[in-house]
Structure formats: C-alpha cells, structure tokens
Amino acid sequence: MGTHGSLTKAGKVRKQTPRLPAKQKKNYPPRLKNRLKYQVRIEKVASARA
C-alpha cells in the first residue's frame, strides 16, 4: 500500500510562500463581543424590517 506522494516533498509549498507579518486583532472582552453580535444580528435586522 503506497502513500500519496513522497514524504520528502512534505511542506514544500508552505516553505516557499513568503511570510507575512501578523495583523493586530481587536480583542474585545466576551461581554462586549456578545453585545456587538446581538446588535448586528437582532437590532439591525429589526430596524431594517420596520
């Protein structure tokens, strides 16, 4: 039973791709994050229907 490609080529594409610097993420506390989700899902939909 053979393998799908040789193990010597494993990770070839990932090594060739250029490394990009990490982007800064806004890390909201869970309470604020849930409030923002609620506003997007519920309040904006309700105001659009009214």
Swiss-Prot record:
Protein name per UniProt: Small ribosomal subunit protein eS30
Keywords: Ribonucleoprotein, Ribosomal protein
Coiled coil: none
Feature: compositional bias, Basic residues: 11-28
Pfam families, sorted: Ribosomal_S30 (PF04758)
Gene Ontology cellular component annotations, sorted alphabetically: ribonucleoprotein complex; ribosome
One of the GO BP terms on file: translation
Region (Disordered): 1-28
Organism of derivation: Aeropyrum pernix (strain ATCC 700893 / DSM 11879 / JCM 9820 / NBRC 100138 / K1)
Family: Belongs to the eukaryotic ribosomal protein eS30 family.
A molecular function (GO) term: structural constituent of ribosome
InterPro entries documented for this protein: Ribosomal_eS30
Top-level taxon of the source organism: Archaea
